[in-house]
């Protein structure tokens, strides 16, 4: 989640991931990701979607908005209508099981994780995410779902492009401890 220019999707593909589903809502970054995936001949291992993740709905994004990372999802008055999917919808759509989830979506992690069902979260053996506005609710939700969670303490970051420019950023690593029988 938060494919940006495709570098992480390419990394996981080169590290023998079965298949990578990469979501990037910004058309500008999405187009660069397409080029990078083609340059690495990974079109058959990476499904790149010009969609976002979080709370289900739509946003409008200017197609020429040059977001190359570090900004939250903006809703423009004019532009391309971009679909936003919940984690439950994504898990069901791609029939995900025993997957890994990487989340770096500049704030969408809260809607994505806090509103996900236990069933959707249990589709993932490992979750690594960057958080932007605190970790406590995310850690609590993952622990309630049966994950063993480690996290880095937040560091202050000022991002003038973000809706809330004063952020406390860090990483969360979660490992699923729930036994799945399927």
Language-model segments: which ranges?
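Phosphate/nucleotide-binding beta-alpha loop and adjacent structural elements of enzyme active sites
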Residues: 1-182
């Amino acid at each position: 989640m938060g494919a940006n220019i495709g570098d992480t999707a390419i990394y996981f593909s080169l590290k023998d991931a079965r298949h990578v589903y990469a979501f990037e809502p910004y058309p500008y970054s999405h187009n660069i990701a397409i080029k990078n995936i083609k340059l690495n001949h990974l079109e058959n291992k990476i499904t790149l979607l010009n969609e976002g993740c979080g709370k289900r709905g739509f946003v409008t994004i200017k197609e020429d908005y040059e977001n190359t990372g570090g900004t939250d999802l903006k809703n423009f008055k004019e532009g391309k209508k971009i679909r936003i999917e919940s984690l439950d919808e994504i898990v069901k759509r791609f029939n995900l099981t025993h997957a890994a989830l990487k989340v770096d979506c500049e704030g969408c992690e809260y809607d994505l994780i806090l509103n996900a069902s236990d069933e959707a979260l249990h589709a993932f053996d490992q979750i690594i995410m960057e958080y932007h506005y605190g970790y406590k609710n995310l850690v609590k939700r993952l622990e309630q779902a049966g994950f063993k969670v480690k996290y880095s303490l937040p560091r202050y970051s000022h991002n003038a492009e973000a809706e809330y420019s004063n952020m406390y950023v860090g990483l969360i690593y979660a490992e699923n401890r729930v036994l799945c029988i399927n």
